[in-house]
Amino acid sequence: MLWPLPLFLLCAGSLAQDLEFQLVAPESVTVEEGLCVHVPCSVFYPSIKLTLGPVTGSWLRKGVSLHEDSPVATSDPRQLVQKATQGRFQLLGDPQKHDCSLFIRDAQKNDTGMYFFRVVREPFVRYSYKKSQLSLHVTSLSRTPDIIIPGTLEAGYPSNLTCSVPWACEQGTPPTFSWMSTALTSLSSRTTDSSVLTFTPQPQDHGTKLTCLVTFSGAGVTVERTIQLNVTRKSGQMRELVLVAVGEATVKLLILGLCLVFLIVMFCRRKTTKLSVHMGCENPIKRQEAITSYNHCLSPTASDAVTPGCSIHRLISRTPRCTAILRIQDPYRRTHLRNRAVSTLRFPWISWEGSLRSTQRSKCTKLCSPVKNLCPLWLPVDNSCIPLIPEWVMLLCVSLTLS
């Protein structure tokens, strides 16, 4: 038969509790968000023979109600924990063995605060170590991923680029890797703390930026690292590129030259064949000299030695065709008209078809006759009217004399 303990013994035991209940743990712990931290802890409590139940422990946040609020971590499987810390805060130690170590993963900024440990051993031991509280500080994640490039990036040759976060917590939620670049067309594979990208660079990728993003979903934070690609070319590739560039430039220049020639030809065809009006009708003196020279050429006694232009007029009066006249008067189209008969042309004051007979030779001389309306005359060539400046006619008739 067990007798109840005297009341004064129970009171004396309660006074000695503070001396026997002790907790050894760091006062302050700092961790970056998304990472993990291990808080070592040792707990001591009195050994009472009458308490036969198992020892359980819990970590609670400062200011909570012991009877209404749940702990952030506990070793009691029957007790619920807070949803905000469920799966992230874990009581690793066994309070039965005086170990109250706490493990925190996927740390979040709202985890910052004060925490205390509580031990329970039914039916008599229930103690909260509020005098030895833990201060937890969660700061922003300052670390960035590492991008490793093996050797040199050569254009046209695949390379494996590795993005890693060796400082990440293995016990935490695996991070998510993603690559960003205008040159990416390849696939990537990843492990717990790294991602390998199979990348085949091209010459145009030189100088572009490649970014690796790492997202820690457990904490809702993302970090990144950006590098600039340095793509090299082999000598053979360089020669090929130079040849291709030169070939393209040559083709473009050739096309441009052909276009210019075409435009020049079209411009010359449509341009009215004129000589600058510095002689002829606007110069009465030279016009009179030309008329006098022309009349002298018509004289039977005229000599070519005295008047060189007479050979042209006599050629006009003797030849059955006026092709020689066309060769002189149309310097821009003389090549085109060199072998063409007069039958394809129409003059407003002379009308003929085919070769000129001897009875029509005198009509050829009318072309150079000084008339009242000599300025201007119109010459239809291929159904197009070309205005003849009087100087042109003068030059036709007495070209050698005026030159």
From Swiss-Prot:
Which ranges sit in the Cytoplasmic compartment? 268-403
Q: Which InterPro entries match?
A: Ig-like_dom, Ig-like_dom_sf, Ig-like_fold, Ig_sub, Ig_V-set, Immunoglobulin_dom, SIGLEC
Keyword Membrane assigned to the entry: answer is yes
Please report the stretch or stretches of sequence annotated as the Ig-like C2-type domain: 145-228
Modifications made to the protein after synthesis: Glycosylated.
Disulfide pairs here are C36-C169, C41-C100, C163-C212
The Swiss-Prot or TrEMBL record annotates one GO molecular function as:
carbohydrate binding
Result of knocking out the encoding gene: CD33-deficient mice are viable and fertile in a pathogen-free environment without any obvious deficiency in overall organ development and growth.
Ordered alphabetically, the record's keywords are: Cell adhesion, Cell membrane, Disulfide bond, Glycoprotein, Immunoglobulin domain, Lectin, Membrane, Signal, Transmembrane, Transmembrane helix
Residue ranges spanning the membrane: these are 241-267
Entry's localization field: Cell membrane
User: Which ranges carry the Ig-like V-type domain?
Assistant: 17-120
Q: Which residues bind N-acetylneuraminate?
A: R118
What would be one Gene Ontology cellular-component term for the protein? external side of plasma membrane
Bilayer topology annotation: Single-pass type I membrane protein
Gene3D superfamilies from the entry? Immunoglobulins
Any single biological process term in GO: cell adhesion
Q: Where is the signal peptide?
A: 1-16
Q: Which residues are glycosylated?
A: N110, N160, N230
Q: In which tissues or organs does this protein occur?
A: Expressed on myeloid precursors in the bone marrow. In the peripheral blood, mostly expressed on granulocytes.
Extracellular-side stretches of the chain, per the record, are 18-240
Q: Fill in the subunit field for this protein.
A: Homodimer; disulfide-linked. Interacts with PTPN6/SHP-1 and PTPN11/SHP-2 upon phosphorylation. Interacts with C1QA (via C-terminus); this interaction activates CD33 inhibitory motifs.
Function in brief: Sialic-acid-binding immunoglobulin-like lectin (Siglec) that plays a role in mediating cell-cell interactions and in maintaining immune cells in a resting state. Preferentially binds sialic acid to the short O-linked glycans of certain mucins.
Query: Any idea what this protein is called?
Result: Myeloid cell surface antigen CD33
Give the source species: Mus musculus
From the UniProt record, report the name of the gene that encodes this protein. Cd33
